[in-house]
């Protein structure tokens, strides 16, 4: 079993690896122990956001120097999930997850944090947003749970996926082979990819039966969702990266995790209740929180708590950017700062207009 350490480090630019270098050089983490890095980069979070790819490349190169591996080999052993968009008060940062063998001499009472990773195969352009992506993701989630030593779905608290999107070149490739992509709108393809990935998580966690999952389910049947899913689409990969985070009696981490679901983009009360479930009940105790991870979206019916919003009809700013700013501010108002992980686009991730979240804290 494992001992998990988690570090949140600020970023001064998308290519900034100084925080990671400092963790390694001061001996706080061994480079070989790093299994995942989740980051918020200061791009637009849309199709042409290359800050995600740049950040991943720089982090992989940094770790590669310490591991004496080429960057592409680092990306095969470390799950990199870069989420673009730090609108509003959101602050660019990385969350580094390190995993080493459990420390039997210091085994705490109760369940503690554990984490596992897995990767799907590369997807053909015509598979993105469809049943193939759903089933492949479900299989990867189960492998990540086994990798983490999470024995029961009840002990699973958050599943993070990084998934691909469609580009004009990918669309042309599909058509050249006589295949039709799920959409020809590259921005819309992000939603399809996130949605299919989320439904794959729902299949793995038994929140949705396989009989209800067909191509047409994605972005159509909003009754289908996962309360544990967080999916982020990007231009920098062709497969899905999966991180499963939960708890285990055998884990020896000093950390714990709890999760909840925001009913809408401003549901700070749910975040507060989940934090309190970890025994954090005052502002003085907020420093126990390592990070909060959340999904956010503009309510697709155009209404928040009975009042009309204009996030979906703004021709200048994509709705995912609005949603990140709103939910980022709501969570920041609870924890007291904006260095939290909020990802836009919550298709099939929690209720329409809301989204799942998780809190990692020191026990």
From Swiss-Prot:
Where is the segment annotated RU A? 1-104
- Please list where the region (RU C) is annotated: 255-363
Give residues annotated as binding substrate. Answer: 52, 83-84, 194, 232-233, 324, 343-344
Specify the enzyme's EC class, one word.
hydrolase
Please provide the record's keywords in A-Z order: Hydrolase, Magnesium, Metal-binding, Plasmid
| Residue segments, region RU B | 112-249
Q: What's the EC number here? A: 3.5.2.15
Active site at 162, 232 (nucleophile)
Q: Name one GO biological process term.
A: atrazine catabolic process
What's the domain of life for this entry?
Answer: Bacteria
Catalyzes what?
A: cyanurate + H2O = 1-carboxybiuret + H(+)
Q: Name one Pfam family in it.
A: Amido_AtzD_TrzD
In this chain, the site described as Important for substrate specificity is at 320
Which pathway does it operate in?
Answer: Xenobiotic degradation; atrazine degradation; biuret from cyanurate: step 1/1
Q: InterPro entries, per this entry?
A: AtzD/Barbiturase, AtzD/Barbiturase_RUA, AtzD/Barbiturase_RUB, AtzD/Barbiturase_RUC
Concerning its family, UniProt says: Belongs to the cyclic amide hydrolase (CyAH) family.
Note the NCBIfam families from the entry: amido_AtzD_TrzD (TIGR02714)
User: What is the protein's quaternary organization?
Assistant: Homotetramer.
What is its biological role? Answer: Responsible for the hydrolysis of cyanuric acid, an intermediate formed during catabolism of s-triazine based compounds in herbicides such as atrazine and polymers such as melamine. Catalyzes the hydrolytic opening of the s-triazine ring of cyanuric acid (2,4,6-trihydroxy-s-triazine) to yield carbon dioxide and carboxybiuret, which spontaneously decarboxylates to biuret.
Q: What is this protein called?
A: Cyanuric acid amidohydrolase
